[in-house]
């Protein structure tokens, strides 16, 4: 086979590979979102155990939830803009790494302050990661029919994650 034959040959499985890669990327994005949604709902169910284990007062216990929500809600729009400027993939990966590291800190927390601080950092990571997911899906799936399927899968995972988190939180506590 000459160089010209290779150039004029029928296209190979590139389109199938590209399509497969897009759906694998969607799988990764959905796993990241599932992690974020699971965490939010598991913590709510686990609050009584957290209160007993770390000796929280009722008023201080609210900060376990509030620290996360303040960071997440406060940074969501900014995180989306940062993703537009320096790259959504980069921001997603940074956010996921920050979120995962903060989750580990939450798991090993021995004090109220450490848990509240780790929850704040978790909110930062969650905002970074989740702010760019839909933008990435829109860019990866430009064809309307495929985009609708991808957003449907993403929406299902996010919704199911909330339900699974409540059940899992109850089972773990």
Question: Model segments located where?
Answer:
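Transmembrane-helix bundle of Major Facilitator Superfamily
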Residues: 2-173
């Amino acid at each position: 086979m000459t160089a010209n034959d290779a150039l004029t040959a029928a296209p190979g499985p590139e389109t199938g590979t590209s399509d497969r890669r897009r759906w694998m990327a969607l799988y990764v994005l959905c796993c990241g979102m599932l992690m974020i949604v699971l965490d939010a709902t598991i913590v709510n169910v686990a609050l009584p155990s957290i209160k007993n284990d770390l000796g929280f007062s009722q008023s201080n216990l609210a900060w376990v939830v509030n620290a996360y929500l303040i960071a997440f809600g406060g940074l969501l729009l900014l995180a989306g803009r940062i993703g537009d400027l320096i790259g959504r993939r980069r921001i997603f990966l940074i956010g996921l790494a920050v979120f995962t590291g903060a989750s580990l800190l939450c798991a090993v927390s021995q004090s109220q302050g450490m848990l509240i601080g780790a929850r704040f950092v978790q909110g930062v990571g969650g905002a970074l990661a989740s702010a760019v997911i839909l933008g990435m899906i829109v860019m990866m799936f430009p064809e309307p029919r495929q985009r609708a399927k991808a957003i449907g899968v993403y929406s299902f995972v996010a919704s199911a994650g909330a339900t699974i988190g409540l059940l899992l939180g109850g089972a773990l506590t």
